[in-house]
């Protein structure tokens, strides 16, 4: 298993949180997980989808059978405790008010070293009535620069305590071309179509 976290202590903390947190998460929210087999067990990959809640990040850690690095807003790193914890969990700090070149470089470095990145192209939790917010170009840009496959996902339902009311579905992995505008539109449409299919199926 690729370990971009580097230090063994950080690796152990990630494993502890995953081992303890995953059963609790599944016990409390009882999620339905579809298409987990579409996430490669090793090698570079970008996992991305619609952002419905701050709890979505729990799926990024609990479901894949590997270390997954997530992009998180820099405000979470402001305190010493927050900075130590989130970096130990493999999170990459992103300043959303600028084109954060440091975050981009760190994400690309993870992928070039055969790691996994999870991100939400909308850039924030979607609290609107729109099915999806316009996608930023980070996911397709990283995929193009590092020749990493994208695994799209959708989360449907609501997070309700001790009720089987939330579902995450992972789609098939695919590679992008060089036309980032076209590929960003394709990614957005892929996720929209997955959401519409879930709605049609009543799931």
Predicted regions and their residues:
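Short gly/ser/thr-rich secondary-structure transition/capping motifs
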Residues: 26-34, 98-101
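Small-molecule pocket liners
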Residues: 29, 68, 166
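Short acidic-hydrophobic, aromatic-tinged amphipathic segments that line or gate anion-handling sites
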Residues: 33-34, 92-95, 176
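A secondary-structure boundary/capping signal
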Residues: 35, 72-73, 90, 120-121, ...
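Glycine-rich helix-loop-beta junction characteristic of Rossmann-like nucleotide cofactor-binding loops
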Residues: 36-40
